[in-house]
Amino acid sequence: MPYLKRVLLLLVTGLFMSLFAVTATASAQTGGSFFDPFNGYNSGFWQKADGYSNGNMFNCTWRANNVSVTSLGEMRLALTSPSYNKFDCGENRSVQTYGYGLYEVRMKPAKNTGIVSSFFTYTGPTDGTPWDEIDIEFLGKDTTKVQFNYYTNGAGNHEKIVDLGFDAANAYHTYAFDWQPNSIKWYVDGQVKHTATNQIPTTPGKIMMNLWNGTGVDEWLGSYNGVNPLYAHYDWVRYTKK
């Protein structure tokens, strides 16, 4: 084989092996099983969003001060107003990404028209990945219901609203989803409430929780009336890798 061809073959082979190694490493670096009772804030494990807004339907600015751990051993997200018609909100997310497994949270959402309290996984273009997301969302206008949803490479419209039979804002309950290659199952207090099997997300994402007020989405959330402060409470979070 001529020398130049040998060099080119080695370069191509090396590039392929490098790409394979990066892919394998990225997969290996997804987080393992954990349980966080929020007896304190682990800044090596979690990150607080701070100083920016998602824009569009989000009518608030994320502030680190709106994410706190209380003396009751819970994480609390706040929606506040520092000045007239300006709003600050809270978002907490994991440092690492997580893949297939069981995601659980014990929480109480905030109750008020025009707001969302959530627990979800997310990854997207800002992370250099497709937009994949799995949601548990409470629309504050009616906290006797929960909304499940997911996105695969940016394609959504998988909303499912489930009647809980209780007001989620009044007491802690456990909500979960089990994400597997061919399905997602959502649970409330250990009981399966919804199953999806079509176009399931594949990309590991960060575990996230947020509380925010909307704008321009009154048909979905209802109109936010400016009431504040409002709080969403999170007793614990658990992930079991499968």
Give names to the regions the model predicted.
Residues 1-12:
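Bacterial N-terminal signal peptides that target proteins for export
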Residues 4, 15-18, 75:
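A hydrophobic membrane-anchoring feature enriched in long, contiguous, low-charge segments
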Residues 14-15, 115:
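Repetitive helical segments and hydrophobic/amphipathic motifs
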Residues 27-242:
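GH16 jelly-roll
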